[in-house]
Regions:
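Alpha-helical, largely C-terminal catalytic domains
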Residues: 1-753
Length: 753
């Protein structure tokens, strides 16, 4: 009996099939035999695959559906890649997941890595069918692609192999990931970014290097990956979870997290799949063309990006059709419900599907996403108790920092009206004192020396000022172009060569503060660290544009995009990066990019972001007209009340904190051993982890103490000014500078931290 009934899928693009499918079926069967995949023994007896297994799984059909336009030779190559990756997955399962052999699994993966060679390097002799297949495919593919593509493909292939160890470790511990951890890790282990690289091969259209790391292209790949993986999890739950004992499946993850039935969890996974596909469409049709026009990309490169996006869309449609037909999956009735082949083709044909049922989930989700009322009276949201296992530590220099911080803000002009903005001062002195950012700095960087604490306080003040100023200066007028110009100016005040003096004259407190902070921060840093910290600041500032854009559209963000962008708008990388400055030269390059430390940091970041959204809910929703709040995003996505949404966000924060503790107890010691760090470097990394504890406990304490989130304070601050002879109505983006019955002197833009 099937575990659940498959939900109604959002299918906005028709599947098509490549005419060379029969040729590739014959070719890939012979290729797999030649590589040794059809006579590899399984430890429990029998073979990993035999000829019948490969025939009924029909990977040639998968590739014919997912790459409908490529020629026969290319389809053969693509099909062989998929045969290889599925063989790797099944061989790894048989050899190591069932046996729990972590050491053997690591050796197996390390052996495969040696076959991803650079120009002029000779691979070793293969010791098994997976190595033989990879050596052959590398020789047939990589010489025809650019160095940039090779670099990206090595990374995605590395991830899908290496992160199999994460799955194996969770199986051994009988541990099911939390939803956020699962989405992040599934991208790495699930292989869809790898599939996106092969779309470039099949389409003969490489993504231009200058766009490969941009937000639109990254979102295209991430939404594609998430949709592919979520769809696969729905179809494969029966086999993976009920029959094979896997625990890396989104249906199982949500079933456990929400304590709901399998059917309810499947419906939630499908809702998330729909949301990710809608974001893919928005990004492909709006953000990506706008970026190409802004960068002045030549027509040929624009065509390549369009072909890549269309290839990803074809993959989604074809991948669904294959899942609906393959013997590998639970799919009773799915093929008939998918609508079959045919229909109009190409990006943007979602309105021309013959069956309304195939687009109805998307229409329902899109309408709810844009239906948020303005300034609803939500009242205070009780958000305690928050799980916090770490003690609070406070700097002895707090009082000095408080005195210093307000003087610095005054000197930078942050407490005065900025000419040309059309609004009053972003803050007055009492606003700044009520914020008490020095108190926050004294806890998140509790071990800082006096001058370091001053610097940390000033960075918090600068980031919070900018986050307030953007909606006030640019939001109410919807002047997104002016916001973009301001954003483009800010990097001028962060020169990588600190000896250069060609920055323009600062035009406002935001620029003046950044110029001052950069001189005080970047001077002692190594060039690599300086570049990394500069990127962290830029990422935060650019995320403010994303918020303005969503406000202009009155669009409540997709939950996955919100969580990932919230880390940026919160300035998480920037504030965490400040704590690394003193120890930058004492650790090996690249260690902060390992899965262990990135997962440790993102778990901490999400905890902090969620607690901020819980405490600031009334302030942001009722008084500022925000759409960027995790409680609201949860309300909107799940169509639940605010108390239910609050409880879910509290549970998510706890899950991320428990993951943080899990990594501290297991992943961090393994990382230190694997990198063979000396005592000094070990002390730096463990000190960094300790600092993250201070960071989270300090942010929680600051929110508990800070006036700005308390209902009485908010009502007083936003009360009508009796001196005003007129009332101000909501006007434009975020309405942060225009409240009903509130004077411009009392209406302050939303602090997002």
């Amino acid at each position: 009996m099937d575990a659940f009934t498959l939900p109604d899928f959002y299918l906005s693009h028709p599947a098509r099939i490549n005419q060379h499918v029969e040729r590739s079926r014959r070719h890939t069967m012979e290729w797999a035999r030649r590589m040794g995949m059809l006579d590899t023994p399984a430890p429990r007896g029998g073979l990993v695959w035999d000829e019948h297994d490969l025939a009924v799984m029909d990977y040639a059909l998968l590739c014919a559906y997912t790459h409908p336009d490529c020629d026969g030779l290319t389809l053969d190559l693509i099909t062989d890649w998929y045969v290889w990756v599925f063989f790797f997955d099944d061989h790894f399962l048989e050899m190591f997941k069932y046996t729990g052999d972590l050491a053997g699994g690591q050796d197996y993966v390390d052996g495969l890595e040696r076959f991803m060679t650079a120009d002029g390097e000779d691979p070793p002799e293969p010791a098994n069918a997976a190595e033989a297949g990879l050596r052959d495919l590398w020789r047939r593919t990589v010489p025809h692609m650019s160095d940039d593509w090779r670099r990206r493909f090595i990374l995605s292939t590395h991830n899908l192999m290496v992160e199999s160890m994460w799955e194996l470790d969770n199986i051994n511990r009988n541990r099911v990931a939390n939803p956020i951890e699962y989405i992040q890790m599934r991208r790495r282990v699930g292989g869809a970014p790898w599939s996106a690289n092969l779309v470039e091969v099949a389409a003969g259209a490489e993504v231009p290097p200058e766009l490969a790391g941009s937000r639109p292209v990254s979102v295209l790949v991430d939404t594609f990956a998430d949709a592919v993986h979520l769809r696969n999890d729905l179809f494969s739950y029966q086999r993976e979870v009920r029959e094979e004992g896997e625990n890396s499946n989104a249906v199982l993850v949500l079933e456990r997290f929400f304590d709901c039935s399998t059917q309810e969890a499947a419906e939630l996974v499908n809702d998330l799949l729909t949301s990710r596909m809608l974001q893919f469409e928005d990004t492909a049709l709006v953000e990506t063309p706008a970026l190409m026009a802004e960068r002045g990309l030549p027509p040929g490169r624009q065509a390549a990006v369009a072909a890549f996006a269309k290839g990803l869309q074809d993959w989604q449609a074809g991948g669904h059709e294959w899942h609906a037909r393959s013997s590998r999956y639970m799919n009773d009735g799915a093929a008939a419900r998918s609508g079959g082949l045919g229909g109009p083709t190409g990006l943007g044909t979602s309105a021309a599907r013959p069956a309304l049922s195939s687009v109805e989930p998307g229409l329902r989700r899109r309408s709810r996403q844009h239906a948020q009322p303005l300034l609803p009276q939500v009242g205070e949201l009780e958000c305690e108790p928050m799980y916090m296992p770490f003690a609070l530590v406070r700097s002895p220099y707090l009082d000095d920092a408080r005195v210093y911080a307000v003087g610095w803000a005054r000197e930078m002009g942050m407490l005065e009206h900025v000419p040309g903005t059309g609004t009053g001062a972003v803050w007055n002195e009492q606003d700044f004192l009520d914020l008490d950012l020095a108190y926050c700095a004294s806890m998140i960087h509790a071990d800082a020396e006096r001058e370091q604490l001053y610097l940390s306080s000033d960075w918090l003040a600068w980031g919070t000022y900018g986050d307030d100023a953007y909606p006030r200066w640019f939001g109410a007028t919807r002047n997104l172009e002016a916001a973009k110009l301001q954003t483009e100016r800010l990097p001028m005040f962060m020169p990588l060569d600190t000896e250069e003096d060609d920055a323009p004259e600062p035009a406002n407190p935001l620029e003046r503060g950044l110029a001052d902070l950069w001189l005080r921060t970047a001077g002692p840093m190594r060039p690599e660290a300086r570049r990394s910290f500069r990127t962290a600041v830029q990422v935060m500032v650019e995320s403010w544009l994303w918020e303005l854009h969503n406000q202009a559209l009155n669009r409540v963000p997709d939950p996955v995009d919100y969580i990932e962008m919230r880390r940026r708008t919160f300035g998480s990388d920037m504030t965490i990066g400040l704590s690394r400055l003193a120890h930058d030269e004492e650790i090996p390059e690249g260690i902060y990019e390992t899965r262990t430390l990135r997962e440790l940091e993102t778990a901490a970041q999400d905890y902090a972001c969620f607690l901020n959204d819980l405490y600031s809910y009334q302030k942001e929703i009722e008084f500022e007209g925000e759409v960027h709040n995790m409680v609201l995003v949860t309300e909107n996505f799940l169509d639940v009340g605010r108390e239910t949404a609050r409880d879910i966000v509290v549970d998510l924060a706890r899950a991320r904190m428990e993951q943080f503790e899990h990594i501290l107890a297991t992943g961090l010691p393994d990382l230190l051993d694997a990198w063979e760090l000396d005592d000094r470097a070990r002390a730096v990394i463990t000190g960094h982890a300790e600092g993250l504890k201070y960071w989270m406990s300090g942010i929680l304490e600051w929110h508990r103490a800070c006036l700005r989130y308390k209902g009485d304070y908010l009502r007083r601050k936003h009360a009508p000014d009796p001196r005003a002879g007129f009332s101000w109505g909501p006007s434009g983006l975020g309405t942060s500078a225009a409240r009903l019955g509130r004077s411009p002197s009392t209406a302050a833009g939303g602090v997002r931290s």
